[in-house]
Amino acid sequence: MNKLLLDFFKFLFSLIPLFFVQLIGILVGHIFHIFNSKTRDLLVDNLTNSKIYQNRKDLKKAINRNIGETGKTILEGFSIWLSKESRILSWVKEVEGLDGIKKAQENNKGIIFLTPHLGCYEITSIYYGSKYPLTILYRPPRQKWLINLIKQGRQKGFNTLAPTDKSGVKQILKALRKSEAVGILPDQTANKGEGEWVEFFGQPAYTMVLVSKLAKKTGANVIMAFGERLDIGKGFKIHFKTLSSNTVSSPRK
């Protein structure tokens, strides 16, 4: 992305309060939903097949809310990538589970943070990486113009990105052996030959085995991280939950 254009967007997003970022995000989500039939059909199929909702009214509400939350995720992502660290941290209103992190750090075996695509997942790494070293495994996007934006946006504080290839896995292992933390998005489809088929809500899902292998090899503590959205414009609550070794021993757990 052209530096002048990038600087313009940084300036623009610095002027937009979180309330309007999320409000515009809801609108973007609905526009995207209208024009992207593949994503729309996938969302409807997934929520229908989950069988969580007992009637069509509840299902329709869930679909509409999901559309809005997806839009928020997109706009929040850009806002986080383009904003200063201090501004992003001001959006964090509460943090739960810091005792688990402290205990994990005292074990000196490293931490594997699992951050699924729920809520504002971008803010969890910015929060931890503002205090301690964090190596984040990430899959470069197909859109080339996004690569530098994501690298600059996520590598704030003590954060470092590692690609999803052999060199990236080596970076992850090196960080864990130094008793540092790493971040992994566990709900991405694994590369061919690097996953295991498991049943998820009655559907087959090809799930990564990297986390269970890393935990077994290094003895690292595994902690789930989640950025919960509070009321619109009110910021986020970050949750850290330590997982048992049995839970992460296999994707089937």
Regions found by a protein language model. Name each.
Residues 81-253:
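Soluble catalytic domains of membrane acyltransferases
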Residues 1-115, 149-151, 156-158:
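Membrane-anchoring hydrophobic helices of lipid-metabolizing enzymes
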